[in-house]
Amino acid sequence: MSKMDIATKFFHACESLEGRAGCAQYVADDAGFNAQSEPIADVTTVLDYCDWMQGLGQGPLNGCNYDIVSASFDESTSTALFFAVFTGMHIGDGGPVAPTGQTTTSHYVYAVTVNDDNKVSQMVKIWNAPWALKELGWV
């Protein structure tokens, strides 16, 4: 399987809310995570991020979905980029406020680096969190 195939399978597992259990097969043990987005700025591992996504999508944003706009792979850095659109409505419990019934349609990018063992070794999420939080009525 190519590195792009691994990155793509990981992306779909994470965004399909499979959490750590569904994503671990694609992820290196020490895979780091980074995001300059307030809700996830303190998340430091890829698998912890996968669990965060699962909690968000099975809790306050139950029924959320995503669409990939574009995907590419840079062989020189072993990094896949996924530009996607996340859509979710705050209808479930677990958010910072009671369910608002408001929806966000939020652009984001995953930069997923795959190592020579064909495992995700690093991930960066680029996301305008304040936009999404405002649309959801959370700020």
Please report, for each region that a protein language model flagged, where it lies by residue:
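C-terminal and inter-domain tail/linker signature
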Residues: M1-V139
